[in-house]
A protein has these predicted regions:
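A polyanion-binding, active-site-adjacent surface
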Residues: 2-149, 153, 159-163
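C-terminal capping/extension of enzyme domains
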Residues: 126-143, 162-230
Length: 230
């Protein structure tokens, strides 16, 4: 059967051990390509085609490192500001000196590389993921990865990817949206997915690179504590 996902999720050594016995899978929003001078850049990052797979083994930058595009995020779990901000949320649940990313599985929701922007000075930077960057394939890949990894908790970064995931018409597996907003301010709800023999907890927080992340950090920490100590 053809895979819906393009990106191979990062599954660390201690994923099955989990945090407080819970396996946790994190979904960020998207990956970006900053190689704006690459001959394949325009096609590989096309927001119309939404498909980088043609260049999986042809990307010059990755070939030079003996890598494939689909290997992300194996090479992106170190150092990024969003990752370090997010790690702070989970740091109370691991021992001093331990890396939280030794326990948390990670991938991104959007299944192709988004383009970056280049300003007049030549500086290349990423921009926020937008609703038009998403496609039905991304949701199918989301479900596929959950079925493969069977986490107890799925963490969703940001409001853009949360929209299709928490849309009853798009996601028939979610069953307690009303209670989610009434009881947990939108942070916690649940899914029942075929081929997974337990309910999945969805934990929706703001994106760790956003201003709202810092503004709502205490709320997120409070609901995460409730979730992990159940």
């Amino acid at each position: 059967m053809e895979k819906k996902r393009f990106f191979e999720p990062w599954i660390p050594e201690k994923y099955n051990e989990g945090i407080n016995g819970k396996k946790i899978l994190v979904f960020g929003a998207s990956y970006y390509c900053k190689e704006v001078n690459c001959p394949y850049y325009k096609d590989c990052t096309s927001v119309e085609k939404k498909d980088s797979s043609l260049y999986d083994k042809r990307c010059p930058s990755y070939i030079a490192s003996n890598r494939c595009l689909h290997d992300e995020p194996s090479y992106t779990t170190d150092g990024a500001r969003a990752n370090s901000n997010f790690a702070r949320l989970f740091s109370p649940y691991v021992k001093d000196g331990e890396d939280i990313w030794d326990y948390l599985a990670f991938t991104n929701y959007v299944q192709f590389f988004l383009p970056c922007s280049k300003d007049d000075s030549g500086k290349v930077s990423s921009a926020p993921t937008l609703p038009e960057h998403l496609s039905p394939r991304d949701f199918d890949a989301f479900i596929e990865v959950i079925q493969e990894q069977k986490p107890d908790v799925v963490v969703i970064w940001g409001t853009v990817i949360a929209e299709p995931i928490r849309d009853r018409q798009n996601n028939p597996f979610i069953y307690d949206l009303d209670e989610c907003f009434d009881n947990t301010e939108g942070y916690i709800c649940h899914m029942n997915i075929p081929n997974v023999d337990h309910d999945i907890v969805l934990f929706n927080c703001y994106h760790p690179s956003s201003r709202s992340w810092n503004e709502s950090f205490e709320d997120a920490a409070r609901y995460l504590d409730v979730l992990l100590k159940r």
